Amino acid sequence: MSRKDDNQSGEVGRTLVDFMEVAITMIVYLKGFYPSAAFERRRYMNVVVQRARHPELRDYIHSAASGLLPFIEKGLVERVAVVFFSEDNVPVERFIFKITIKPSCAALVEEGQLEFALRSFLIKLSVSKSLVKPLPLNCRWEVTAYLRSLPQVGSSKEAELWIPTDTKQWQNPPVLTPVKSLNSEPLCLQLYLEHPSLSEPLNLVNPEDVAPHDP
């Protein structure tokens, strides 16, 4: 890969990270996890979106999204999930972003074209209230990254921001609900919902994934 291709790949990664920060905020708003007054309307990519008012919430989302950048640039990120849990730490709903970036094609796309494509995801999210399920009482949520290989602790400051989680995993295949997909060069992106199947047992197993440190 040439230096120019590497720079272009970095631009794609930064655009994707900025988008992820906005999309995660919209998902949390969509779920009604916090009162609507905890958010304020802003415009991003010419779409009306939500921005967290509370500094700690805003910083957590920003840190989770921006912390993905070095791993996205290295092609390590396979999926990013916004996971909602019951009080027993059992996942009840996952918003999954499946990511593939083709660095060799990054120089072929203009930033405006990429933003236009990502804009359609934000528009779709804003009208997806009917797809989500009500949250249980005393629930919580987190951002989880599924990596193709785990970074070694101490290998970089970025790696230290992420820790393996003890999140329980469904044993049966989940119920999938597609939301939006993009299949282009250099970015392929899928957004879909996962819910546990009706036959899901109560005893769940732990996966190989990582989550950012709590703020």
UniProtKB/Swiss-Prot annotation:
Q: Does the keyword Calcium apply?
A: no
Pfam family, any one: HORMA
Q: Which domain of life is it from?
A: Eukaryota
Limits of the HORMA domain: 10-193
User: Which cellular compartments is it found in?
Assistant: Nucleus
| Matching InterPro entries | HORMA_dom, HORMA_dom_sf, Mad2-like
User: Which keywords does UniProt give here?
Assistant: DNA damage, DNA repair, Nucleus
Gene Ontology BP term (one): DNA repair
Question: Record's GO cellular component, any one?
Answer: nucleus
Q: How does it assemble?
A: Forms DNA polymerase zeta with REV3.
| Family note | Belongs to the MAD2 family.
- Provide the function of this protein: Regulatory subunit of the error prone DNA polymerase zeta. Involved in damage-tolerance mechanisms through translesion DNA synthesis.
According to UniProt, the name of this protein is: DNA polymerase zeta processivity subunit
Q: Which organism is it from?
A: Arabidopsis thaliana
Gene coding for it: REV7
